[in-house]
Amino acid sequence: MNKSIAPAPVVAAGDVKFGNSLPLSVIAGPCQLESRAHALEVASALKEIATRLGIGLVYKTSFDKANRTSAASARGIGLDAALAIFAEIRDSVGLPVLTDVHEAEQCARAAEAVDILQIPAFLCRQTDLLLAAAATGRIVNVKKGQFLAPWDMGNVVAKITTAGNQKVLVTERGASFGYNTLVSDMRALPIMARTTGAPVIFDATHSVQQPGGKGTSSGGEREFVPVLARAAVAVGVAGVFIETHPDPDHAPSDGPNMVPLRDFEALLRTLMEFDALAKKRPGAGTI
């Protein structure tokens, strides 16, 4: 273990750069990896949008949804089937890829085909998982637990950096507030930037999730995704995390809080304008 290693202020996944003072980048894709054809369809559409807008984009999808509300809910195609699809998205579509890992043993295998390993919020304090992810040398994106204060993420980041990996992102996704409800405290964004030194991501879609809100599955209020995303980008963040799907009402997981793919480009255009104003780059003031 190393001592007093600061996280990198700018983290690059291929050509996509995340930095709190850099132009906004985005992490986007469907909640669950449903099939090769579906993944390539969505990844190709997102690549076209990102190229048209000139914004950095990392493709996100999960090979296993290990924390579903009900044991009967669809979990995904599994790591074995997902690896070749992840590699194809990177090589053929040309997008960096992010996926969740839930167990230490998954990290090295997933790292063979993805650029960013994501630690789910419920697991953000699991030391062995964090150390295994750090050991791969890949970027590690840690979602802040709904039960943590933003300044508590300093200890989480330190577990990764003292293991020798400075490539860390921290993601805000709301805090538990009573039953089946999350709230987003925008103060958490600059606090996490200050106390961790890492690039900060705002998860706009999971922040409107209603955990367990539909009894055997989670609910969500997708109409508030643009509201919270605009607020976070106005504060100033390195990136936004937005789950999107061609038909979210029939998606196997997280449909109620995913943005329809047809609405994705317009939302990004707005967020880029807010970002330019927040960071006072040329072109700011066009909102």
Curated annotation (Swiss-Prot):
Entry keyword set: Cytoplasm, Lipopolysaccharide biosynthesis, Transferase
GO annotations of cellular component type: cytoplasm
InterPro entries hit by this protein: Aldolase_TIM (IPR013785), DAHP1/KDSA (IPR006218), KDO8P_synthase (IPR006269)
Keyword flag Cell membrane: no
Locations listed in the record: Cytoplasm
Keyword Mitochondrion recorded: no
One Pfam family this sequence matches: DAHP_synth_1
Reactions performed catalytically: D-arabinose 5-phosphate + phosphoenolpyruvate + H2O = 3-deoxy-alpha-D-manno-2-octulosonate-8-phosphate + phosphate
Highest taxon of the lineage: Bacteria
GO terms, molecular function: 3-deoxy-8-phosphooctulonate synthase activity
Entry's EC annotation: 2.5.1.55
Family: Belongs to the KdsA family.
Annotated protein name in UniProt: 2-dehydro-3-deoxyphosphooctonate aldolase
Organism: Rhodopseudomonas palustris (strain BisB5)
Gene name for this UniProt entry: kdsA
